[in-house]
Amino acid sequence: MIVSRTLILIDPSSPHGEGGLHVLSDDDQAVTLLLTLDGGSARSLRDFAKAEDIDVSMAGLIYLDQVVNRVSVHTDDIETISTSGSDTVGEIFHVLQHRPVSRVILPASLPGLTGGGLGRLLHACPVPVLVAPRAQAGPAPFRIAS
């Protein structure tokens, strides 16, 4: 049986970047986390990679592993995707073409989804799109672990 997934975009550069995790419901039994490694949302990952002398893709994997630990209290079916593209909307549509997705959840802070980008997504997306509210208090942006 193919399980329909909830696609959640993550923004490690903002305290609101994991807002999508806070709106998961009991209906979201399978989750796909999408992280873009280029553009404004990856700024803190690039800083971490430089400080640790590792590739930004490795920094992304470390960050996604931390997010998976936070999501795992909700579901065991968690998939992670990191992309090198800076076109967030294009990356969402690419995932939608290859995975059974029932809805898309975006953080309110995600760069690249202002103006035309968000409008294009809302107009053309075949599944519901939810913009998660900004968190009152939540996880801080991705920080370098000491």
Residue ranges and their predicted role:
Residues M1, S72-V104, S146:
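Structural beta-alpha unit
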Residues R103-C125, G138-P141:
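Glycine-rich, Arg-bearing micro-motifs that act as flexible, cationic patches
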Residues F48-A51, Q66-V71, T114-A124:
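Short, aromatic/basic amphipathic alpha-helical patches
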Residues I2-A49, A124, R134-A135, A145:
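Small/aliphatic-rich secondary-structure junction motif
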Residues T32-L34, E79-S84, L130-A132:
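General small-molecule cofactor/ligand-binding pocket signal
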Residues P12-H16, S84-T88, L110-G112:
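Short beta->alpha connector loops
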Residues K50-I62:
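A short acidic, glycine-rich active-site loop
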